[in-house]
Amino acid sequence: GYMVLASAVHYSDRLKAAIDIVGISNFVTFLTNTQDYRRDLRRVEYGDERDPAMRAFLEEISPNNNVEKISVPMFVAQGENDPRVPVTEAEQIVESLRNAGKTVWYMNALNEGHGYRKKENRDLYQQAVILFLEQHL
């Protein structure tokens, strides 16, 4: 997820395409939109966005704030009901990439959470990935 997005920001010249699965696209919005019961644990893991210096750092490393550096086609996969990474993380990176004129495919399974567990969604996802890679590799 996040590592794919970060790799696309920093190493687009070495990649042909990228597939982001339930990735954090902006740490500040991720922490803001994470459910209350998980937020404090995520702050320990990633940093506390309420601290101005940490907030600035989190904004700086967030792929959504660096889409101009992404030059590879991107496939973004998300589950609408993801309790770990809010769907807004996928929606905002897709919107930013599209607004910047970048190539982006988006698959949001409305009946899934963090990853695709249902066979019909896994099958559709795998077919979409094959098409994406055939087109961009």
Predicted regions and their residues:
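Active-site-proximal cap/loop segments of hydrolase catalytic domains
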Residues: 1-137
